[in-house]
């Protein structure tokens, strides 16, 4: 079966594993998914990420992060730009998520960036997701 929106599938897998407090999960790899996983790690939303090569496309293994009392670090994940309705933002219209408490993941000509990085580089692009 052909997957229509692999980014939404990745976010849904992370959301579901986070809700039942799994320690790790595996996602079929792609370059864009790897960049999104790296951003989530760099911003402190996940504990670790590793890339496992296999005979097909590879696997991204994501290790989820929880607080001291087992509370979730990722409160919410939302796919913004979808295959049926793409959402773009100019460099001066890059959105803020919860007044800076969350991040927007944006695909720009300079790579996949957070909203803060896109503002600093004055780059616009496709708004992939919000994470808070």
Swiss-Prot record:
GO CC terms in record: ribonucleoprotein complex; ribosome
Pfam families according to UniProt: Ribosomal_S8
PROSITE patterns linked to this entry: RIBOSOMAL_S8 (PS00053)
GO MF terms, alphabetically ordered: rRNA binding; structural constituent of ribosome
Keywords tagged on the record: Ribonucleoprotein, Ribosomal protein, RNA-binding, rRNA-binding
InterPro entries in the record: Ribosomal_uS8, Ribosomal_uS8_CS, Ribosomal_uS8_sf
BP-aspect Gene Ontology terms: translation
Highest taxon of source: Bacteria
Similarity field: Belongs to the universal ribosomal protein uS8 family.
Subunit structure: Part of the 30S ribosomal subunit. Contacts proteins S5 and S12.
Role noted for this protein: One of the primary rRNA binding proteins, it binds directly to 16S rRNA central domain where it helps coordinate assembly of the platform of the 30S subunit.
Record's protein name: Small ribosomal subunit protein uS8
Organism the protein comes from: Bacillus velezensis (strain DSM 23117 / BGSC 10A6 / LMG 26770 / FZB42) (Bacillus amyloliquefaciens subsp. plantarum)
């Amino acid at each position: 079966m052909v997957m229509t929106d692999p980014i939404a599938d990745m976010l849904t897998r992370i959301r579901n594993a986070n809700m039942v407090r799994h320690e790790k999960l595996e996602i079929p790899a792609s370059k864009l998914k790897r960049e999104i996983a790296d951003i989530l790690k760099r911003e402190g939303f996940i504990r670790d990420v590793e890339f496992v090569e296999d005979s097909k496309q590879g696997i991204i293994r994501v290790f989820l992060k929880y607080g001291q009392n087992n509370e979730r670090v990722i409160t919410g994940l939302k796919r913004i730009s979808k295959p049926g309705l793409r959402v773009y933002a100019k460099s001066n219209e890059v959105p803020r998520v919860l007044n800076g408490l969350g991040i927007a993941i944006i695909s720009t000509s300079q790579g996949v960036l957070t909203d803060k990085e896109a503002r600093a580089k004055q780059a616009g692009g496709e708004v992939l997701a919000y994470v808070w």
